[in-house]
Amino acid sequence: MKFLGKWKIDQDKWLPILNKWISMTPQERANAGDGVKIIGRWHDTAARTGVIVVEANDIGAVARYIGQWNPYMEVELSPVVDDEEAAAIGRQIVADNKT
């Protein structure tokens, strides 16, 4: 499954997390832990927000990864699907709602 994480960092947490982030190597930043693959991550540094898309079969593994960042920021996590998966789900919804 794919998951979309949206984060927001409070102003008082911004510099501490920024210092943590810039001290990490690219390999450390790319490591989401066993069973979690980072598809992409985008930052809005002016607004102190961003998004990440990860893929994993185990929500617990995703929760562990997100949990390491929770002391610094609020994170909303939602399961997401790609176009083909959404089309298949949409076909099923339409079929289920035929009268």
Predicted features by range, described:
Residues 49-51, 74:
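A common structural microfeature
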Residues 54-67:
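Mid-chain, well-packed structural core segment of small domains
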Residues 64-71, 95:
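Short, intrinsically disordered, mixed-charge
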Residues 72-83:
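Conserved short beta-strand edge segments in small beta-sheet-based binding/regulatory domains
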